[in-house]
Amino acid sequence: MKHLNTVMAESPALITIFLLGYLLSTECAVFLDRENATKILTRPKRYNSGKLEEFVRGNLERECIEERCSFEEAREVFENTEKTTEFWKQYVDGDQCESNPCLNGGICKDDISSYECWCQVGFEGRNCELDATCNIKNGRCKQFCKNSPDNKVICSCTEGYQLAEDQKSCEPTVPFPCGRASISYSSKKITRAETVFSNMDYENSTEAVFIQDDITDGAILNNVTESSESLNDFTRVVGGENAKPGQIPWQVILNGEIEAFCGGAIINEKWIVTAAHCLKPGDKIEVVAGEYNIDKKEDTEQRRNVIRTIPHHQYNATINKYSHDIALLELDKPLILNSYVTPICVANREYTNIFLKFGSGYVSGWGKVFNKGRQASILQYLRVPLVDRATCLRSTTFTIYNNMFCAGYREGGKDSCEGDSGGPHVTEVEGTSFLTGIISWGEECAMKGKYGIYTKVSRYVNWIKEKTKLT
């Protein structure tokens, strides 16, 4: 024993070796190997364990699920801004497209606290709920609209205009385009033109507007031969307002050898449109354009002689004085267009019907300012609402054919009147005025329960353009 103690005291290295050997011999009883240990206990490894995150490639679970991440951290994972943005929109506040809010086949794109619908062709609106064809709001076109074969809106403009950069608006290409007064006044507008398209729904409207207006030459206006004295040629504006100089530059007055007798409207530099019943064979007619106050010379007037009159080929005064009541006058020399002499616009048949259905046109002239009263000196104008056909038919014992329409006020007091015949009924559309009617006839003037009767211009648009060479 003494010898052993001496050896251990003198040989500490031997003791160390002995202890290590003992421990190694007992390890298998305490620890399992790596493979068996993982079968008993699994624990997710923390990705930031042992290494700096700045030096580890981005991982979506580490960056944005275990912890709240920033956009930049998410960008490290996707390494693409577009993909990161798509993820971020849902990550921040959930998927706004989950309820599928887009209608009519629209594709929903999620955004932060909102969403965006990518609409199919022909639809628009926040949820693609609106028909974007010409049926609704005229396809947002300011004048004419048509649908292409693939249901896209194609806007166009009348003569003297072209499409603006937005492909919706129309801008003039000539100094004095049709239907525009170039002199502006601070007073109120004649009509509420700015609301025309926004308030109209054209779906199936053309069926309601288009009419069967073929009338045989033998058709007779009921009782017209017996009661013609009760019909007054429309030559006045009762209850209207004084126009401003240049406010209605397409208006003309027709002078006979003795006095003025009818009105008319400028179609172009060489042609005037008026009522056929104003014309009498052999009469000499002088047209005065740029007129304002017929009792004064204002140096804006242009006087032209009529060298040819063309009543509509179906007009026959001996059979019916007011059916097809429209005529064209050819001037001896062209008018000089300026701020006081400007033509009215003439649309195609379809759009002339549509514009008429807007329901708010206006008439103008120097006719009598009250029933059986004096003739106006200053050009008058009056807004006249369109009257539905059923009401119009009930208001009179005379036949109202489909080439006519009624406009005016049931309460009376406002109307076109004797002396206004042949003048224009105009509808203003987004700041441009279009011819929609011709003042024709009525029972007395501004009587309660009676309306003014107008020639429906849409029936004669093709004829007007053919004869006056408008394209």
UniProtKB/Swiss-Prot annotation:
Positions of modified residues (4-carboxyglutamate): E53, E54, E61, E63, E66, E67, E72, E73, E76, E79, E82, E86
Record note on modification: Activated by factor XIa, which excises the activation peptide. The propeptide can also be removed by snake venom protease. Activated by coagulation factor VIIa-tissue factor (F7-F3) complex in calcium-dependent manner.
List keywords of the entry alphabetically: Blood coagulation, Calcium, Cleavage on pair of basic residues, Disulfide bond, EGF-like domain, Gamma-carboxyglutamic acid, Glycoprotein, Hemostasis, Hydrolase, Hydroxylation, Magnesium, Metal-binding, Phosphoprotein, Protease, Repeat, Secreted, Serine protease, Signal, Sulfation, Zymogen
| Residue stretches making up the Gla domain | 47-92
Q: What class of enzyme is it?
A: hydrolase
Which reaction equation describes what this protein catalyses? Selective cleavage of Arg-|-Ile bond in factor X to form factor Xa
Q: What is its EC number?
A: 3.4.21.22
Q: Which residues bind Mg(2+) 2?
A: E72, E76
Where does this chain mainly localize? secreted
List Phosphothreonine occurrences by residue: T206
Family designation? Belongs to the peptidase S1 family.
- State the oligomer form and interacting partners: Heterodimer of a light chain and a heavy chain; disulfide-linked. Interacts (inactive and activated) with F11 (activated) in calcium-dependent manner. Interacts with SERPINC1.
Name of the protein described by the UniProt record: Coagulation factor IX
Organism from which the protein derives: Mus musculus
